[in-house]
């Protein structure tokens, strides 16, 4: 429930240099992934022809729907998503709203909560990014650790938009282990429906079972969305990135404690090096590799169906 097909997530400081760096190929993709080489091209998913082939691979593996959460600050292109959907037969559900503070348009700094809310309501009900293509989910709404005042205003606007449209909200929390809980507590304090809140990137943020279960007890949906990132190296903070086996072990702990219906999984592909054609695993990885692993590790077909079909279907239904 969290991918990017067309986006540009180039860090602002790197973008300001104007340097694109090396072309990505099979010989340097791992050096780029481990930070030994820098290539701004890593952060650009802007090749519609490549995207079509990558999504076709997912469809061939049995996938039917992609939740595409490229939002304000990441250069969304709704028209390209529509073209890719038509070319592949895949359903693409588009997000809306704004990413973290540093990526946002400077004009956002003076905007009000009501202004952000009206924008997101319009993106869901009428069309987003100067098109008539409507968003089907709000997000990924970005926040950093610590949370900035601008990000809080966007989040408050997203809550109003949720109330008006019935769409679910996906939040990108900061990388501090306390921030997912901070976001969940904020939603609780606002009286928001917790089963309509998806907290992304939990598999790079929370590694303690007690902390994970406390978060789940709020009723939010917990998203492990970095499946396929198997290396322990993580450039953004000093953590040991879990592999897919550890992800499945933590999800089993959630299930054992009654939280099966609060789990969604994905890849969050936002780097070119994670595409098959640049040496990566692609959008088909969960279908071809993770689900067979789940079966080998004792996940029932009913559990897999809940995670892969029923919970996403519930979240993508407006209420």
Which stretches of residues belong to each language-model region?
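Short acidic/histidine-rich active-site segments
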Residues: 170-172, 224-226, 258-280
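Catalytic pocket-lining loop regions of alpha/beta-barrel enzymes
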Residues: 159, 163-253, 263
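Acidic (Asp/Glu)-rich catalytic clusters
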Residues: 56-60, 81-89, 124-133, 160-163, ...
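Divalent metal-coordination and catalytic microenvironments
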Residues: 2, 66, 98, 162, ...
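Active-site beta-loop-alpha junctions enriched in small/polar residues
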Residues: 4-6, 71-72, 97-101, 140-143, ...
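Active-site gating/metal-coordination segments in enzymes
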Residues: 65, 83-86, 91-165, 221, ...
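Alpha-helical scaffold segments that flank or form the walls of functional sites
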Residues: 1, 14-70, 74-88, 116-133
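Mid-to-C-terminal alpha-helical segments outside catalytic/metal-binding sites
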Residues: 285-319
């Amino acid at each position: 429930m969290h991918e990017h097909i067309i986006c540009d997530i180039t860090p602002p400081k790197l973008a300001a240099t104007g340097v694109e760096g090396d072309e990505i190929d099979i010989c340097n993709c791992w050096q780029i992934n481990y930070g030994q080489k820098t290539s701004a091209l890593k952060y650009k998913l802007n090749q519609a022809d490549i995207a079509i082939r990558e999504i076709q691979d997912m469809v061939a593996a049995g996938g039917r729907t992609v939740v595409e959460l490229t939002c304000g600050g990441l250069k969304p292109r709704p028209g390209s998503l529509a073209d890719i959907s038509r070319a592949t037969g895949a359903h693409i559900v588009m997000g809306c709203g704004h990413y973290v503070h540093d990526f946002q348009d400077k004009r956002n700094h003076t905007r009000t909560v009501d202004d952000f809310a009206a924008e997101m309501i319009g993106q869901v009900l009428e069309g987003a990014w100067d098109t008539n293509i409507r968003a089907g989910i709000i997000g990924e709404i970005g926040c950093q650790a610590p949370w900035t005042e601008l990000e809080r205003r966007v989040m408050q606007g997203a809550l109003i938009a949720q109330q008006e449209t019935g769409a679910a909200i996906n939040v990108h929390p900061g990388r501090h282990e306390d921030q997912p809980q901070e976001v969940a507590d904020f939603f609780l304090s606002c009286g928001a429906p917790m089963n309509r809140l998806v907290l992304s990137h939990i598999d790079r943020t929370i590694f303690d079972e007690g902390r994970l279960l406390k978060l789940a007890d709020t009723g939010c949906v917990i998203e492990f969305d970095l499946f396929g990132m198997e290396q322990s190296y993580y450039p953004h903070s000093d953590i040991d990135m879990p592999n897919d086996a550890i992800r499945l072990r933590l999800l089993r702990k959630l299930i054992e404690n009654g939280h099966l219906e609060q789990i969604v999984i994905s890849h969050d592909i936002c780097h070119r090096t994670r595409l098959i054609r640049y040496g990566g695993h692609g959008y088909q990885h969960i279908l071809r590799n993770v689900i067979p692993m789940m079966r080998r590790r004792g996940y029932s077909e009913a559990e897999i169906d809940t995670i892969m079909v029923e919970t996403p279907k519930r979240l993508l239904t407006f209420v």
